[in-house]
């Protein structure tokens, strides 16, 4: 096929201006950035709702095998049967863990998985001629991506309030359901780290109204191998392989937001779904080929390493570590937003501390940097004032949790005795308190030429 000329309007009039940088300078630049960065391999990283667990390096070794890195998605399938086996086995294991019937690995990340799952729900209702179902119900404690994904899929979002206990208000859910209900998006355990104990009643309410129930797998790490979303009444789910199944995440990817569903939604799956998909009712591809295949390789390595028993132990360890740290911090004088046992994460509120001392959640988080720890998630969920959300994960040792608790206890004492010290934090990092608003609105993302 002959090349077609680029239209004149899109051709360069002159050669592009490119940086002239020595390889040694490039190497030093990235080495310096690496020294300034902080990751799970550097220290305690309790970033709530992000599951920053240690990722076994075995997964990296296997994902680097030439048999995986040297394939091409358009080569004949009989020449890539090993790769096909990876997708099949990983999908089967994840269906077993979630209680779903089918799995697709096309979505490239969590929010992409949400969007895909919602398109399945939409296709289901449209195919049945039930086009009046245009509302997705979302708890007020949900991840911000939930309402955003629902809006992108063409739905109207209706918020469901939480009770004082941090759980979905059943009566409010019942009142919100109706003939316009397409579905409910839910995380369980929820975003404040509590298990929705009325989950069976909740899914029954939505199903009785004619809607479907979507499981946001962001917090699956707390229940994998113990309880299955499919058994709770969920019809479709997404999984963050780059969180729960120990494939590195952060920095923009690659990720994998695998989507699983019950048999009633299988006809609508994207074309490369396991066990079928791609028929007349399919929503169509949401990503080219098999998407981020090497992330699936890492996840399969993790699953095969742990086995059934290990997967359950990982979930139990995550819950144990969260409750241990929560108890230590409460004993030190911190206030929990929701007292009692938690699941894999918990939320502290510094509202009273701020009123008493002027020290905010931001101040404490910045001070943690000086202690060699990554801060927890700040000011989320939005229903908790001055929130700090901790998720220690199962890969942290008791000694690490003890050191973290001791450091946080010392910071609390400093907040009460010398609040100005926390207002000035951090003092040991290369960057102190940048103008985050300016950074978000005017990012510097290209090479800066020295003029003159």
Q: Can you annotate each of these PLM segments?
A:
Residues 1-102, 119, 227, 279, ...:
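Non-catalytic terminal extensions of PLP-dependent enzymes
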Residues 254-326:
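Mobile "lid/hinge" segments at catalytic clefts and subdomain interfaces of large enzymes
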Residues 51, 109, 142, 190, ...:
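Short, flexible loop/turn elements at secondary-structure junctions
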Residues 38-58, 106-117, 245-260, 290-295, ...:
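Conserved phosphate/anionic-ligand binding catalytic regions in large, soluble enzymes, centered on
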Residues 72-75, 105-107, 187, 243:
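Cysteine-centered functional microenvironments
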